């Protein structure tokens, strides 16, 4: 298990590389060029700037999250080939900087969805919150205004250029069925996987968050069967998944440890986080500690150890604690606590295995 930490870049993140360097066991940053619109090539010079900044703090930049997929590709429009070619060129540029994994998603219009970025919790901290009834009754424009109200930081997946054409996008997706979206993903993967393979880069799709349709838009990476289908679209080790325990775990029917065991060799990157589910479909982000939420974090880490996981993992969304002023879900303190909790489980399992091996001799 190789621990990494998401960093949004100098001037775009309240957390410094110097502070991340002080978290035990973190070896690299998970990064992106957030100002480059989907469909444009990432300049090699900009990529190398990030690499240089990271290496000054002894970090690698092996994992990128995300290289966003242009909506024309998801819609299957004739213009998609131009954007796919740009995506291929970005893959080649990233390979020159030593990148090994590209996390991306194939969610129409919206990336992750929450209704409250600062939900007050019982302990006085705040966290990301999803209220199902509000989403069911909300006009999509209202959701955009909720997310856009955070003026301090850019919000990945909620870029202004994407949301400015919201009405047009919704009209375009009226004609896209779930099977159409699968076909468009298949087309995309057939084009980019050979390039990624040649560049020794793994493509790792992120599950839909939350894992069910919203506003009538199709969502296709939501459960065990979907993931199995995804991996067979282009059945090659380069075609993988970013296994996110929080996104998949929002659906109580998803058994993440079982997914880890079945798909182990196709998981180059993992997000581990905890959420507390409610019977009405709501959920709230919690600390990583298993008892604080509904996700079986201990069994998840044990499953990764059991399969000999050597991929990258990062703590995911944390609470906002100790009056930290930070990007929603991405402060320093709670994610650092999460890392130490994950290491504690991992080390405990590893030491237990070592003792078992010694006594068995």
From Swiss-Prot:
Top-level taxon of the source organism: Bacteria
InterPro entries, per the entry: Man_deHydtase, Xyl_isomerase-like_sf
Pathway: Carbohydrate metabolism; pentose and glucuronate interconversion
GO biological process, one term: D-glucuronate catabolic process
Keyword ATP-binding among UniProt keywords: no
Catalysed reaction equations from the record: D-mannonate = 2-dehydro-3-deoxy-D-gluconate + H2O
Needed cofactors: Fe(2+); Mn(2+)
UniProt keyword list: Iron, Lyase, Manganese
Enzyme Commission number(s) of this protein: 4.2.1.8
NCBIfam families (UniProt xref): PRK03906.1, uxuA
Function: Catalyzes the dehydration of D-mannonate.
Protein's name according to its UniProt entry: Mannonate dehydratase 1
Species per Swiss-Prot/TrEMBL record: Halalkalibacterium halodurans (strain ATCC BAA-125 / DSM 18197 / FERM 7344 / JCM 9153 / C-125) (Bacillus halodurans)
Gene designation per UniProt: uxuA1
